[in-house]
Curated annotation (Swiss-Prot):
Single GO term (MF): 2-C-methyl-D-erythritol 4-phosphate cytidylyltransferase activity
Protein name as it appears in the record: 2-C-methyl-D-erythritol 4-phosphate cytidylyltransferase
UniProt organism field: Shewanella loihica (strain ATCC BAA-1088 / PV-4)
Function recorded in the entry: Catalyzes the formation of 4-diphosphocytidyl-2-C-methyl-D-erythritol from CTP and 2-C-methyl-D-erythritol 4-phosphate (MEP).
UniProtKB keywords: Isoprene biosynthesis, Nucleotidyltransferase, Transferase
Organismal lineage: Bacteria, Pseudomonadati, Pseudomonadota, Gammaproteobacteria, Alteromonadales
Site (Transition state stabilizer): R20, K27
E.C. number(s) listed in UniProt: 2.7.7.60
């Protein structure tokens, strides 16, 4: 460990509607084990002792957030998000302390463990991680196929050195803000924070995360997330439980 992160702000882009879920309300407000998905996600972040503040980017039309019990938490503040994820993250970065590190986490990943947050922070307190930042990720386990026209298999892709990018992703506020702004100005497709850092020449570290840190995207994911949360709540050694 060469340099302890002194100030850490979590950023949650939550201005999207989650169209693939096909629900009548934004997916982050769907109920999961007696409270909305977003409430679980915020609990994971607000309860972590290393996180000083949580900034959540909301749609200007959001009528659900104020109903959450977490909405009045003293560590939490809100900003107006944008049309795309990167716009929402950038809005939050603009009000964050410029000397802090930003831990950006998906609103629809409610099963994040404190242990994974600890691992990610520890990676960024090493010499290489302090220079490059890091993301939670998971090695690809399944055989990968690339499709051609009509949905037929074009080729099998070697899965060696392939990873699924997860969140949180952790970078210094000042560099992430600059690189995101520059990439958006250049009309670069930014799918996560690491892609903005890569575009600027960075090589963020990959930190192996838990398989249960799933993103709720489709209806069946709700059932799986519920099982993971129930299992964590019944395990006294788990750092995900309520």
């Amino acid at each position: 460990m060469i340099s302890r992160i002194q100030e850490l702000v979590a950023i949650v882009p939550a201005a999207g509607i989650g169209a693939r879920m096909g629900a009548e309300i934004p997916k982050q407000y769907l109920m999961l084990n007696h409270q909305p998905i977003l409430a679980h996600t915020l609990d994971r972040l607000l309860e972590h002792p290393r996180i000083d503040k949580v900034i959540i980017a909301l749609s200007p039309e959001d009528s659900h957030f104020a109903k959450l019990s977490q909405a009045s938490h003293p560590k939490l503040m809100t900003v107006i998000g944008g049309k795309e994820r990167a716009d929402s993250v950038l809005s939050a970065l603009k009000v964050a302390s410029q000397s802090a590190w930003a831990l950006v986490h998906d609103a629809a990943r409610p099963c994040l463990s404190a242990a994974d947050i600890d691992k990610l922070i520890a990676a960024c307190e090493t010499e290489e991680g302090h220079q490059q930042g890091a993301i939670l990720a998971m090695p690809v386990r399944d055989t990968m196929k690339r499709s051609g026209k009509g949905g037929a298999i074009q080729e099998t892709v070697c899965r060696e050195n392939l990873w699924h990018a997860l969140t949180p992703q952790l970078f210094p506020v000042i560099s992430l803000k600059q690189n995101l702004a520059d990439a958006l100005a250049a009309q670069v497709a930014i799918t996560d924070e690491a892609s903005a850092m890569e575009w600027a020449g960075g090589q963020p570290l990959l930190v192996s995360g838990r398989f249960d840190n799933i993103k709720v995207t489709h209806p069946e994911d709700l059932q799986l997330a519920a099982l993971y949360l129930q299992a964590a709540a019944s395990d006294p050694n788990s750092s995900t439980g309520e």
